[in-house]
Amino acid sequence: MRGLFVTGTDTGVGKTEVACALVRAARAAGLDAVGMKPAQSGHVPGEPSDAERLREASDRVEPLEAICPYTFGAPLAPAAAARLEGREVSLARVVEAARALAARHAAVVVEGAGGLLVPLTARETHADLAAALGLPVLVVARAGLGTVNHTALTVEALERRGLAVAGIVLNRTGPEDDPSVPLNAAEIARLTYREPLALLPWEPDIARRARSLGSILGAKIQF
């Protein structure tokens, strides 16, 4: 399977933005890429869900249920949200859905939920999903204070499991003036032996930010 698995160091770090930007950049370059969200939970009515945003980035080439096999109401990890509804997530079903997309498209960008070790099923985490898919993992992290520890831990967890690290992207998720931002990339590189691929700037205009991310990431990340 050709593509990327996009994980984060936490929830709210910008995984969906990055995944959508990667899909758009790939499609603009002539590669038939499609996004996938294996399981989403806590969707706020009236706002586009992560899966809907990935479908839009993919030019609506697939129905929503093909892009997102599982949807839950509670804003919890997929395994916990499924339990509340008396349901269970199947790793085999998710892998089958991803392979079906890969059979119809040149590349699949799979966006996980939360961080790498967030439980996907009653027994498996998103790390297990990345391993089952055999995809390199792109780590999306906050640019500001606290990211050095979170990012180093995530990279260490990937390496201990023998998962390929496609790179690290630091994302400014707000306009706050954080003096740690200019220093964090160097610290992460020193600890992980991996220079972050990009430091994504904050941009309040959503459309402009989407174009900016696509331009930056399209030049940095190939799959």
Curated annotation (Swiss-Prot):
Residues at the active site: K37
EC numbers on record: 6.3.3.3
Membrane recorded as keyword: no
Annotated positions binding Mg(2+): T16, D50, E111
One protein family per Pfam: AAA_26
Matches recorded under SUPFAM superfamilies: P-loop containing nucleoside triphosphate hydrolases (SSF52540)
GO terms, molecular function: ATP binding; dethiobiotin synthase activity; magnesium ion binding
Cystine crosslinks: none
UniProt-annotated location(s): Cytoplasm
Signal peptide: none
Binding site for substrate: S41
Cellular component aspect of the GO annotation: cytosol
Record note on quaternary structure: Homodimer.
Family to which the UniProt record says this protein belongs: Belongs to the dethiobiotin synthetase family.
Job description of the protein: Catalyzes a mechanistically unusual reaction, the ATP-dependent insertion of CO2 between the N7 and N8 nitrogen atoms of 7,8-diaminopelargonic acid (DAPA, also called 7,8-diammoniononanoate) to form a ureido ring.
Entry protein name: ATP-dependent dethiobiotin synthetase BioD
Species this chain originates from: Anaeromyxobacter dehalogenans (strain 2CP-1 / ATCC BAA-258)
Gene encoding the protein: bioD
